[in-house]
């Protein structure tokens, strides 16, 4: 019973990937903006940074799901734990990065740019595990 509850709580933590990031002190989710046009206001810049973060998160979620499905149960549990803790780290690291402009209208943009950048870096790490070559001793799955 306790193990099942723990599994559900860990799954909930990963399912709320975006929600955890949104829980930072940057306010509500910005309204969608056409970022193909040059944004004219700080609010539009903030919204475009958030949209970039959402795109980075979608790619990260895809890589995570693919890797999770390609490893055994023990590795899947470890991956879930690592990903949950990484999300918490990313949020705190970006809070630190934006602390110099906290309270300013640019703070949300700095936060979302940081989170998008870190998420793309994490996606690259997950992709490395997905595409490891034979002989790579850090490979956690069977090489292709």
Language-model features: locations:
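N-terminal alpha-helical modules
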Residues: 22-144
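N-terminal signal peptide c-region/cleavage motif recognized by signal peptidases
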Residues: 16-18
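Leucine-biased recognition of intrinsically disordered, low-complexity hydrophobic segments
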Residues: 9, 20-22
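Bacterial N-terminal signal peptides that target proteins for export
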Residues: 1-12
